[in-house]
A protein has these predicted regions:
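Core subunits and conserved enzymes of cellular information-processing
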Residues: 1-130
Length: 130
């Protein structure tokens, strides 16, 4: 089912590369703005998703190596998501991206499809119910 939300495209440029902190900050900002589901380059992000920088050379999500551009899709109220990212001086795009001369494009979209999570959910302290 297609849903409303935003698509954020993060791209490296000649002067600066998107790094893991840019990705993590974007995920946090989207969650704070009310995102109900998020994916990066087609990989569903859940509360147990492992986002890591490997050898200071690439970003890995769970077992998937990612390269720029990073296409981040978020389902939720597109107005709230966009305004949360675009706030002057305190929003993600102005504070993180523009200040560091990186490239980010934020677009509202009403045809977003985020795949189901296909990884294994592991728990340490709870057991599955019957």
């Amino acid at each position: 089912m297609l849903e409303d939300g935003v698509i954020v495209t993060l791209s490296d440029n000649a002067q600066s590369q998107i790094d893991i902190y840019d990705i993590l900050q974007l995920l946090n900002e989207l969650k704070l703005a009310g995102a109900e589901a998020i994916s990066i380059n087609g990989i569903r992000i859940v509360n147990t998703t492992d986002v890591a920088l490997i050898n200071n050379s690439y970003i890995k999500i769970d077992d998937n190596r990612l390269n720029s551009p990073y296409i981040v899709k978020a389902i939720g109220d597109p107005v709230k998501l966009e305004s949360g990212l675009m706030q002057k001086d305190s929003g993600y795009v102005d504070k993180i991206i523009n200040a560091m001369d990186k490239t980010a494009i934020v677009e509202r979209n009403d045809n977003i499809l985020i795949p189901k999570y296909d990884g294994k959910m592991t728990t340490k302290y709870i057991e599955m119910g019957e």
